[in-house]
C-alpha cells in the first residue's frame, strides 16, 4: 500500500483543513441511534492506527462495541454503578485538580449543567445524568481503550495521542465522539463483558452521529489563551 505524502511546505488548503478539523472536534453528549457503517468504522480505526508512539510500540488495544454487545455492556455498567462496584485501574482521587485546573473544571460543569437545566443541588437529576453517560449518551458505538498491564505515564501519553488521533479521524468522517473517563471506573465490569484479560482500561470513547436538536450539544467551552499554557524561548 502506498503511503500518501504531504507537500514540503505549508499550504493554505492544508492549514485551513487542519484548523477546521481540530476546532471542529468537540465532545458530543447526545447521539442519534443511527449506526456508523462498518466500512467507515474500519477506515477510521485504520487511520487512527497511524498515531505516533514511543519507539513505534503502539501500546493501544481497542475494543469497538456495537449492537447487542453494546446494549449488554451499557446495562452491566449501569448495574455496577447502582451497586457501587467501582474498580479503577488508574487511581482517581479528590483534589487531583487544583488551582486553575479546578477553576476550568468548575466552569465546564457550570456550563454543561446549565444547558441541561440541572442545578447542583438536584442530586436525583445528577445521578440520572450519570446513568445516561454509562449508556454512552445514546451513542450506538463505544470504543474501549486498553493499555498493557505495566502502563505508566509514558505509555499513557501514547494512549492519549492515539485517542486524539482517533477522534480527529472520526471528525473528518462526520462522526461525533465523546471521550469518557467515567467508563473506566468500572474496569472489571468492562473486562468481564468483553472477555479482555491482562490489560488496563484507560478510557472509553462513545461515538456515532450527533443529535443536533439536543441543547447539550450547543455548549461551547472556551480554551485557555496561548499565553496561559505556552512559553516560547530562544
UniProtKB/Swiss-Prot annotation:
Q: What do we know about what induces or represses this protein's expression?
A: Transcriptionally repressed by MSMEG_6503/MSMEI_6332.
Query: Where are the disulfide bridges?
Result: none
- Give the record's keywords alphabetically: Flavoprotein, FMN, NAD, NADP, Nucleotide-binding, Oxidoreductase
Signal sequence, renumbered to the chain:
none
**Biological process GO terms, please?**
xenobiotic catabolic process
GO terms assigned for molecular function: FMN binding; identical protein binding; NADP binding; oxidoreductase activity; protein homodimerization activity
Residues where NADP(+) binds: 55, 105, 113, 118
Pfam families documented for this protein? Nitroreductase
Tell me which EC number(s) this protein carries: 1.-.-.-
Cited Gene3D superfamilies: NADH Oxidase (3.40.109.10)
Biotech relevance, as the record puts it, is:
Potentially helps in the design of second generation BTZ and DNB drugs that are less susceptible to nitroreduction.
Instruction: State the free-text cofactor note.
Output: Binds 1 FMN per subunit.
What the record says about disrupting the gene is: Loss of resistance to antitubercular drug BTZ043, but still resistant to PA-824.
Q: What class of enzyme is it?
A: oxidoreductase
Can you tell me which residues bind FMN? 25-29, 137, 181-182, 223
**Subunit details for this protein?**
Homodimer.
What is the documented function of this protein? Confers resistance to antitubercular drugs benzothiazinone (BTZ) and dinitrobenzamide (DNB). Inactivates BTZ and DNB by reducing an essential nitro group of these compounds to amino group or to hydroxyl amine, respectively, using NADH or NADPH as source of reducing equivalents; two electrons are transferred. Able to reduce the nitro group of bicyclic nitroimidazole PA-824, but not of quinone menadione, nitrofurazone, methyl-4-nitrobenzoate, 4-nitrobenzene methyl sulfonate or 4-nitroacetophenone.
Q: Into which family does the record put it?
A: Belongs to the nitroreductase family.
Name of the protein described by the UniProt record: Nitroreductase NfnB
Q: Which organism is it from?
A: Mycolicibacterium smegmatis (strain ATCC 700084 / mc(2)155)
List the gene name: nfnB
